[in-house]
């Protein structure tokens, strides 16, 4: 679903936040990549689409509007095997993410012409917010470069190597993907919230 999602969010100016992402959702060259912090985006959103995420934000720290519609997408969007999960789900779309994105594109296509002005206005607003966050990350990346290597700079260097050699970063809380600048699908993997319990690599 990487390519289809990248196209869909650009066409409709939909900002994407990768909160605790275990893989690359959008390439860093996609203008709609809004970083890793949902704070600010949640409270302003009228619709939130959660893509196959068991914990899309920390409920105690960030909250969405009561009037906001929350759409959960994934093979099991309710995570039905979990005894308790406190995230809202106004609409659930069960299925493989790539297939759901394809159906969403088809459903939205007839509305492209009528929504052009609205999308253009949203795009301008979203890009301003994203640029502000990028400037903050750039400042942090280049701050205190006095010989010591911090996580942001290490992540940036690893990302440059991965992009250059079509490599893959496998990380356990070491790499900060928001600084890595990865542009390709399958170029990053981080253990799930269970800390790699029951996982293995070939």
Language-model features, listed with the residues they occupy:
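Anion (oxyanion) recognition and catalysis
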Residues: 10, 64, 163
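Catalytic cores of large soluble enzymes that bind and process phosphate-bearing ligands
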Residues: 1, 37-40, 89-96, 142-150, ...
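Active-site diphosphate/adenylate-binding microenvironment
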Residues: 5, 127-202
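A short acidic, amphipathic alpha-helical/loop segment
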Residues: 3-7, 59-63, 157
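Glycine-rich, acidic loop regions that bind phosphate or pyrophosphate groups
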Residues: 18-127
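General beta-strand structural signal in soluble alpha/beta enzymes
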Residues: 16-19, 50-51, 93, 168-173, ...
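Redox- and metal-dependent alpha/beta enzyme cores, enriched for Fe-S-associated oxidoreductases
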Residues: 2-16
């Amino acid at each position: 679903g990487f390519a289809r999602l990248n196209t869909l969010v650009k066409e409709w100016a939909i900002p994407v936040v990768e909160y605790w992402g275990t893989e690359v959702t959008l390439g860093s060259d996609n203008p709609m990549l809004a970083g890793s912090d949902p704070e600010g985006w949640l409270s302003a959103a009228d619709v939130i689409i959660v893509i196959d995420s068991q914990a899309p934000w920390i409920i105690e720290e960030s909250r969405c509007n009561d009037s906001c519609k929350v759409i959960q997408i994934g093979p099991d969007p309710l995570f039905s095997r979990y005894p308790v999960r406190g995230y809202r789900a106004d609409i659930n779309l069960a299925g493989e993410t790539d297939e759901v994105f394809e159906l969403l594109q088809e459903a939205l296509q007839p509305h492209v012409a009528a929504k052009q002005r609205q999308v253009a206005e949203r795009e301008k607003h979203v890009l301003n917010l994203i640029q502000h966050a990028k400037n903050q990350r750039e400042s942090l990346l280049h701050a205190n470069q006095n010989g010591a290597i911090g996580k942001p700079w290490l992540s940036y260097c690893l990302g440059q190597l991965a992009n250059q050699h079509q490599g893959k970063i496998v990380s356990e809380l070491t790499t900060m993907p928001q600084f890595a600048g990865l542009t390709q699908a399958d170029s990053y993997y981080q253990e799930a919230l269970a800390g790699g319990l029951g996982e293995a690599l070939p």
